[in-house]
């Protein structure tokens, strides 16, 4: 699925086609959509396909005036009739060039939803570096939110486990521990990527960008 958004009159709004200063949002793109991103919009094929590999690791690289930032995004999904929440991560590619910014990921997620629905204030899609950093900040904030949820669920489930010793609670505890491993690994690799960006060699940072990036790093370290 491909959608296009642009900040109009201070609000992120959906538009019908690519424009300078817009945000191209690709969620589980079909092969024709991938070809459109590569052949028509001129994005690097390896950059576009990077986030379509579940095992892709966080990194930042640049190629012919395009910059790729790969980070893991935390996810939370209910998977059974008893509404057990399963926490995991998936890669997201953020690609910038001199015209627009593109995000690519395998599934819809809370970060993309918040941004596309205009729920995040002060988003300017034409300020590509600032927008990229705001995406990273929302990801870091979402990690913190989910970690707090995991902590709360773990506490409640452990108390139930002591009282009932049922398999359900034991399975949930094991699932939460697995989620924490995913999150820990993702946050460590994301922190390394952010430190590379902070050096300013791949992405040009202005003073305001540096301050925003430092806020992102603080959030990641807290998580």
Which sequence ranges carry the predicted segments?
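Peripheral, non-transmembrane regulatory/ligand-interaction domains of membrane transport proteins
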Residues: 1-222
């Amino acid at each position: 699925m491909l959608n296009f958004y642009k900040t109009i009159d201070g609000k992120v709004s959906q538009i019908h086609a690519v424009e300078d200063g817009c945000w191209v949002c690709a969620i589980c793109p079909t092969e024709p959509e991938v070809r459109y991103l590569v052949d028509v919009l001129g994005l690097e094929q390896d950059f576009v396909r990077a986030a379509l590999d579940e095992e892709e690791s966080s990194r930042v690289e640049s190629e012919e005036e395009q910059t790729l930032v790969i980070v893991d995004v935390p996810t939370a999904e209910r998977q059974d009739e008893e509404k057990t929440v399963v926490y995991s991560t998936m890669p997201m590619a953020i690609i910038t060039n001199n015209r627009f910014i593109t995000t690519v990921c395998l599934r819809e997620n809370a970060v993309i939803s918040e941004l596309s629905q205009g729920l995040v204030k002060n988003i300017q899609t034409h300020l590509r570096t600032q927008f990229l950093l705001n995406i990273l900040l929302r990801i870091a904030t979402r990690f913190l939110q989910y970690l707090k949820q995991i902590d709360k669920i773990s506490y409640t489930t452990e108390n139930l486990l002591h009282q009932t010793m049922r398999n359900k609670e034991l399975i949930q505890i094991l699932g939460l521990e697995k989620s924490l491993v995913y999150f820990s690994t993702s946050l460590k690799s994301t922190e390394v990527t952010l430190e590379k960006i902070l050096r300013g060699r791949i992405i040009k940072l202005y003073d305001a960008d540096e301050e925003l990036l430092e806020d992102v790093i603080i959030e990641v370290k807290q998580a």
